[in-house]
Design a protein with these regions (language model features):
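Non-catalytic, glycine-rich low-complexity segments
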Residues: 26-43, 55-99, 110-112, 159-243, ...
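Substrate-binding/catalytic cleft of secreted carbohydrate-active enzymes
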Residues: 308, 361-370, 376-589, 593, ...
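Accessory beta-strand-rich segments of carbohydrate-active enzymes
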Residues: 30, 42, 87-213, 240, ...
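Extended acidic/polar, glycine-enriched regions
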Residues: 146-151, 234-326, 654-662, 670, ...
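Short S/T/G/P-enriched beta-strand
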Residues: 602-622, 681-709, 713-722, 787-829
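Beta-strand-rich structural segments
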Residues: 233-237, 303, 623-626, 667, ...
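Active-site-adjacent substrate/metal-binding segments within catalytic domains
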Residues: 66-98, 102-111, 115-123, 128-131, ...
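Short flexible loop/turn segments that cap and initiate beta-strands
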Residues: 49-52, 245-250, 292-299, 620, ...
Length: 988
């Protein structure tokens, strides 16, 4: 009786908050995130129902046990990632009773993802083991549940162990290549949402294939036009009742305003204990398109009725769009040409102090930053984005490239079995989301058998979704099954396929370093000798040339800059704690490059002055401005400095500008009319700290996992941020929250302390809500400045037995009343340099290069007296006879220390001899010794530098991936390797 009374109070409380409950006979989906018990250990017997977990920590999902040991170690050059993270077996447990009246229901649990291996137990019984780490999965709990008021115990053993082998090609046969900090930081835990679904035994199946073998509803449209669309709906039904049933389906297509615009109905007899499927269709008049400027999403509400009584409901999204990919013009969406511009992003989406475990609204926050900058495309790399990320893409109009699970390359044995199953499960789960236009089969090529398997799964489970199948770094074998190719650094491996960019502009720069003239750093001195050493200003300027030069061609569909936010995976600079290639840092504070992208990507008038206007006396510097106008005039204190020199369409440069206190203003014009201005002012002396908070919709929830972000700025007497201020700030946090802090980009072990340096006058910290509502106060102190303080109210979050009817929250999006006019194509008039070098030789069938140097290309007929490098003087002398007449890759010696695991992709015919000459002063990179055999022959360059020749013969038509010249970041002097391709020797 007491349990029933508590549930009644719980339900009344939720109704008072407007959360509501499912109506009688309808499906009830419960938030199963709150109030788990957790231990970072592996005690014996932890799966047993009566195990004593009272001493364990109480947490709420999303949760990771690596939230405070990330962004805290120096990056290891060579794309290794953050290997120094705690890993091992951990346990989560939850004791719960079911709500009254649920006896006779089916009960399913859904995990949106657990990293990496999850053993799930109910009342001591093993339900199954999930190993892929990124794809939703679930179980039918019904037969093992106690419905009589006794406690049920669900236990999850979570193991994030990974192999610390830094050479991905030496992983053991049982290792999962994507479970490595190389590609994804190993943030273990129940790091996404957990849901409990209560249904009638006669119900619509869930889109959770592994362990349930079910697919859920599938909706798509054909014959789309501005006047009408034919909507098709497949609704799979399971009858778990003990008698046959005459089932009626009513499906309502509901528009964004909540109005039913189409109703589909059908009747179907379903035998007891069997499965069946409704197939219905109807014509929707005056449809609204889903597209980046108008991401209109309908809801398809499916209701099952027996004898007039509703027994189950399910809802899926529907977006109406057509996609046509062309080789010579790129993408046409709904008949309009669309140039893709956006970013790649890791599916861990990690933050310092939070790791991969974030509330849904924070994933939306990151994607909304992309959209605010004009982004219309995201490539999740190299595992699937989660449910909140994909749903945010639907709402924001961000075209999505969605992979399964991958690192880089093919997989074998158990790893492939897991990868293929995850691919299938991913397609089934996400196939109704309109934002997904590309299913990515892999980050590199795979075997013919594997490509055929993945393509067949796509064709089986998403035959009508209008999506393309693609791989990055494909060869002709993989391309046989592809619809589009995924390029790298503007490359295009498969000339006959449309190309979408997967990774361009893989440079790095930390946010804290302004330029060569700004205190306290005056450049980036700590990075001298590193491969990547750009200041924020240089990084922003580089952004323009990279975008225009690599994606500017009309035949290129556009695509993804790599990467959006600084990440701990794939780091390459030993003086940074992250791979600093993002347009925003790890805490999502924008760099100058972010605003440059906004000036290039957005359709409305934009202008951005790169940098600030608070310099030491006597400073003279070049000022750069980015704008989508066609002219920019610069003013200092009202005095015109003339019009900028325009380059790469969007960049305007003003040389030798003398700094003086006051203001600098950029005025952008288009066709002679002023369209945008930006002004920056000299900041005065810092006098105070200012704190500003950001929370999710409805404010901070006291659910144990919600987060509040707090920006901390040093400001002058006028409230202007002081852009060169860098100094320690000490914090105090009181109230029902856990301090999670932030990080400093160039400092190890800065995570989760109650102190932090401001960088460029600002930093960002976070607090995680507890389970008690109340006032949370954060105070900040800094020597010489007035203190700052802010109070955030956390709101009560009712939950009972670890369950709530209030589901994770995400902001709503406003839609335009009418379809907007097509966005202007600012790149249309750009004549970009060819970024896809032609093969150019007799024996080389395709070639692409991802390094920063230009001019790298294939030339035919290597001979003495021919040029060796594209960027320096020097000519072959004494070329071995076996290499004479070969195709020769004219490499750039400037890239001798550039680090990329896929620097070159070169395709050759069967029988071709591929030779690589490598400087003897260097250690041999793994890719070289793995793919090639050393010979006794050598080249001597500059009469003193010996380069040993390695060779291999192609047994079939194949594409080879060649990596960096060296894996040793300390290397100072060495020549870039040389590549030759010759025909097979004549038969004797």
């Amino acid at each position: 009786m007491r349990s029933c009374h508590r549930w009644l109070l719980f339900a009344l409380c939720l109704n008072a908050l407007g959360a509501g409950r499912a109506r009688a006979g309808e499906r009830l989906t419960l938030n199963f995130n709150p109030d788990w018990k957790f231990i970072r250990a592996d005690p014996a017997g932890a799966a047993a129902p009566d195990f004593d977990d009272r001493a364990w920590q109480t947490i709420s999902a999303p949760h990771t046990f690596n939230d405070t040991d990330t962004f805290d170690d120096w990056s290891t050059p060579g794309h290794v990632g953050e290997m120094n993270q705690w890993s091992g077996r951990t346990w989560y447990r939850k004791a719960f009773t079911l709500p009254p009246g649920t006896a006779g229901k089916k009960v399913f649990i859904e995990f949106e993802a657990v990293r990496q291996v999850a053993e799930v137990y109910l009342n001591g019984h093993l339900l199954g083991v999930s190993r892929n780490g990124f794809i939703p999965f679930g179980f039918d709990l019904t037969t093992l549940l106690r419905f009589d008021g006794r406690k049920n115990v669900i236990a999850v053993m979570c193991d994030n162990s990974f192999e610390h082998e830094t050479d991905m090609h030496k992983l053991t046969a049982t290792a999962l290549p994507w479970n490595s900090p190389h590609w994804h930081p190993a943030h273990g835990g129940i790091y996404r949402n957990v849901l409990l679904h209560l249904t009638d035994p006669l119900h619509i199946s869930l889109p959770l294939f592994s362990f349930l073998q079910t697919t859920g509803p599938y909706v798509y449209a054909t014959d789309l036009s501005d006047q009408s669309a034919r909507v098709h709906l497949e609704v799979p039904v399971e009858n778990g009742r003990d008698r046959d049933a005459a089932v009626a389906l009513q499906a309502e297509i509901v528009d964004a305003g909540g109005h039913t615009v189409l109703t589909l109905q059908a009747d179907l007899p379903v035998a007891a204990g069997s499965r069946s499927q409704f197939n219905v269709e109807g014509e929707l008049t005056a449809p609204r398109w889903w597209e980046p400027d108008q991401p209109y999403v309908y809801r398809v509400r499916c209701m099952l009725r027996v004898n007039g009584e509703t027994v189950d409901t399910a809802e899926v999204p529907l977006g109406l769009r057509t996609a046509k990919w062309t080789v010579d013009q790129g993408l046409f969406l709904n008949g309009r040409h669309v140039k893709l511009h956006g970013w790649g992003q890791k599916p861990t989406d990690e933050w310092p102090g939070l790791g991969a475990a974030q509330p849904d609204w924070l994933h939306y926050y990151t994607l909304n930053l992309m959209r605010e900058a004009g982004g219309n495309f995201v490539r999740w790399g190299h595992c699937a984005g989660g449910p909140a990320m994909i749903a945010a893409g639907d709402r924001l109009g961000i075209i999505t490239e969605q992979p399964g699970v991958d690192g880089e390359g093919d997989a074998q044995g158990d790893a492939w079995t897991i990868r293929a199953a995850a691919w299938r499960d991913m397609i089934i789960y996400y196939r109704n989301h309109p934002s997904i236009l590309i299913w990515e089969g892999g980050n590199q090529k795979v075997s013919r058998e594997h490509a055929a398997e993945l393509r067949a799964l796509m064709d089986r489970y998403d035959p009508h979704g209008g999506r393309a199948y693609a791989h990055r770094r494909a060869d002709e074998v993989t391309a046989e099954f592809m619809d589009v190719g995924i390029g790298t650094e503007g490359g295009r491996e498969i000339a006959r396929l449309p190309v979408v960019e997967g990774e361009y502009d893989r440079e790095e720069s930390p946010r804290r370093v302004w330029d060569d003239y700004s205190p306290p750093h005056f450049g980036y001195p700590e990075a001298r000798g590193q491969t990547y050493q750009l200041t924020s200003e240089q990084f922003a300027v580089n952004e323009v040339g990279q975008y225009v030069g690599k994606l500017g061609r009309a035949a290129h569909s556009g695509g993804a800059n790599w990467i959006f936010s600084d990440t701990t995976s794939g780091g390459r600079v030993s003086v940074e704690v992250a791979r600093a290639g993002g347009e925003v840092d790890g805490a999502r504070l924008p760099k100058e490059a972010y605003y440059v992208c906004r000036a290039m990507f957005r359709a409305d008038p934009q202008v951005h002055l790169i940098g600030h206007w608070t310099y030491p006396a006597g400073t003279r510097k070049t000022v750069h401005v980015a704008s989508n106008g066609d002219d920019v005039e610069l003013f200092v204190n009202g005095r015109s400095l003339g019009h900028g020199r325009r380059s790469d369409r969007f960049l305007f440069t003003f040389a030798d500008v003398a700094w003086e206190p006051g203001e600098i203003r950029a005025v952008a014009s288009l066709a002679g009319k002023i369209v945008a201005t930006e002004t920056k002012r000299t900041a005065g002396a810092p006098v105070a700290l200012r704190l500003t908070a950001s929370t999710g919709p409805g404010g901070l929830r006291a659910d144990g996992s919600d987060v509040a972000l707090i920006d901390v700025e040093a400001v002058d007497a006028h409230g202007e941020r002081c852009p060169t201020f860098q100094q320690r700030v000490d914090f105090a946090c009181t109230g029902p929250a856990t301090w999670r802090g932030g990080y400093n980009s160039g400092e190890i072990k800065s995570i989760n302390h109650l102190h932090l340096d401001l960088e460029c006058g600002i930093n960002r910290v976070s607090v995680r809500a507890g389970r008690t509502a109340g006032a949370i106060t954060v105070q900040a102190r800094c020597a010489g400045l007035a203190d700052g303080s802010i109070t955030i109210e956390s709101h009560a979050f009712p939950a009972e037995n670890g369950m709530a009817t209030v589901l994770p929250a995400m902001p709503e999006v406003s839609l335009p009343a009418q379809r907007p006019a097509p966005a202007p194509d600012f790149l249309a008039s750009v004549v970009a340099p060819a970024s896809v070098p032609k093969a150019g030789g007799r024996f080389t069938t395709a070639f692409s290069y991802s390094g920063p140097a230009r001019g790298v290309r294939v030339e035919s007929d290597a001979l003495d007296a021919r040029r060796i490098f594209a960027d320096r003087d020097g000519y072959f002398d004494g070329l071995p006879e076996a290499l004479q007449g070969a195709d020769h890759v004219l490499t750039a010696n400037a890239d001798a220390r550039y680090n990329a695991v896929d620097l070159m992709e070169i395709a050759v015919r069967a029988g071709a001899i591929v030779s690589v000459a490598h400087d003897d002063r260097l250690q041999r990179p793994t890719w070289l010794t793995r793919q090639f055999q050393p010979t006794r022959q050598a080249l001597t360059i500059d009469h003193r530098h010996r380069m040993t020749i390695f060779t291999r013969q192609a047994e079939r038509d194949e594409s080879l991936t060649l990596g960096a010249n060296t894996e040793d970041a300390a290397t100072k002097d060495a020549l870039m390797y040389l590549v030759f391709v010759n025909g097979a020797p004549a038969a004797p």
